[in-house]
């Protein structure tokens, strides 16, 4: 599959926006610099042809990995996982990041058996907190998790954090890879390229790192 064509499709869909954005990071580090970009992969669900190509790309990363179930990280990862599960004719489950207080109070939606292996799918990885939370819920229910698959790695420590937790993260694109494609195709200016590249360089303030999105 032509990854450059997929990258161009993502740009055309508006998933990468430029400006000055407050992120989840600013809740704990209010003095952190504003992000010069924002990646909104939730938009992909509105473009069926693009979603088809994106999920095929993610399926390619899953070839050779061993798993019995596909688990999403709600809610951003849900459409990707649902379509991939349908394409592969594999069962899908969903860990509940918010504890259900009614009905069965299940921590995981869907049918599964303790001892089965689940592969976790999400849209992107930054600092990995939501991935680690989802994995812990699955493990607490007796499932095995060894691999995480995402569309974009923002290259802000998430892959390393998952590795430290014993998880292999497979990304279709690194952010720097997308930026190089967009720069070569003149979809972004040299100034935008430099602004994002500078932002991704780790910095520290009193309360911790300033780049990225938890």
Where are these regions (language model features)?
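PRPP-associated nucleotide enzymes
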Residues: 1-121, 125, 129-214
